[in-house]
């Protein structure tokens, strides 16, 4: 099992909205990647939001980060303090 992890810092008070939009927008994009196994979104009191995707191979995890970061940059930038980061 392989994990793709993306993290972003929401603007003050926007973490719940950011998490909601991630669940609604990213899951359809990520779940379409072959090898997808699961998806989780968590947020911390400091407005950090972390999305974790699980895959059955490393290439799928990397592909999901590529797709997710493109979507985040296009659709979530107004809610973020700086760019999101990703690792697989």
How should each PLM-predicted stretch be described?
Residues 1-50, 54-70, 77-88:
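Short S/T/G/P-rich N-terminal loop/turn motif that feeds into the first structured element of a domain
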């Amino acid at each position: 099992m392989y994990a793709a992890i993306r993290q972003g810092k929401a603007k003050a008070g926007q973490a719940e909205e950011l998490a909601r939009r991630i669940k609604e927008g990213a899951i359809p994009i990520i779940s379409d990647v072959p090898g997808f196994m699961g998806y989780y979104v968590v947020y911390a009191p400091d407005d950090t939001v972390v999305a974790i995707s699980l895959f059955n191979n490393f290439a799928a995890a990397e592909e999901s980060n590529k797709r997710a970061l493109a979507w985040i940059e296009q659709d979530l930038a107004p809610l973020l303090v700086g760019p999101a980061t990703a690792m697989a």
